[in-house]
From Swiss-Prot:
Source superkingdom: Bacteria
An example Gene Ontology CC term for this record: cytoplasm
Protein name: Ferrochelatase
Amino-acid positions noted as binding Fe cation in the UniProt annotation, renumbered to this chain: 196, 277
Amino acid sequence: MGRVGVLLLNLGGPDKLEDVGPFLFNLFSDPEIIRLPFRWLQKPLAWFIASRRTKTSQENYKQIGGGSPLRRITEAQGEALKEQLHDLGQEANIYVGMRYWHPYTEEAIALLTQDNLDNLVILPLYPQFSISTSGSSFRLLERLWQEDPKLQRLDYTVIPSWYKEPCYLQAMAELISQEVDQFPDPDQVHVFFSAHGVPKSYVEEAGDPYQQEIEECTALIMQTLNRPNPHTLAYQSRVGPVEWLQPYTEDALKELGAQGVKDLVVVPISFVSEHIETLQEIDIEYREIAEEAGIHNFRRVAAPNTHPVFIRALANLVIDALNKPSFKLSQAAQIKKMVKMYPPESWEWGMTSSAEVWNGRIAMLGFIALIIELVTGQGLLHMIGLLQ
């Protein structure tokens, strides 16, 4: 088989407080995160949002030590995966490629092209596929492949999603059991799955399979857990005025509190590493909401991190991928073929839902353009003298 490499893909996170602003700019510059019909708006809007959110985000990172542990944990996962593969008789070089911060995906690609690999497995550390996570990284990789003849000669395969992997499900079940068993009456503990949300339009208009995969994953974990506990699935991390997948985590916690739930375990189902969404959003913000709602016994399941059974799951995925027909980036992109900036709609005049959608989009663009012009002092209104 020759020299084998594994490229682990992840989001990335700021290592220190000074990195927060540039990290947010990179994040919001991605059209898979904020979807606009005009590409030229992307960078100015990203700058505007990042500049407005940096201070608040820095305060959140201060609460977890001043930076994200994501890089450290992901690199530790890579080292553990390398050892596990060695134990299974498969040698491999491991590379970490982050989408929005160091080590960037481009940096990982530069390293692996120097190593003269014969085979590469591209493994996103997102169990469930979404156009805003794995899809964004695949889009970037597809562009890098198109630009580099050396990459085009490399035999590689992609793992689009892997939430059904048995060892992954077993690891999640074990982690949940560890927390549930801390309660006096374990069978009555409410298991609360909190997934990272995405805008509802991603699913309903763009065809993102994320919600379906999250729901299936939740059911499979509960099946593997094989306990009678009631459970709920909700979605966290909503930003902006648009509607995201529901129920929202904060609303679901309040509702469970109103129903009399006292014992609750939160499962961060979208995340395989500790980072800001687990350590600050769940452990601090959602804990406070739950306690105010009357949920007095609040625990959170640890992310898989380097749990041995989880690392075995990653190793199984790599070995299976090496022994199956290759799955190419162009095939992964087929998932995104349905994804357009805005779906095709026929324009209908009058008080129709179609007209309202388009009116809303035009108003949104006008508002964004006005805000950017007011902040930057440059634009059409300044050119014609209406603003000074």
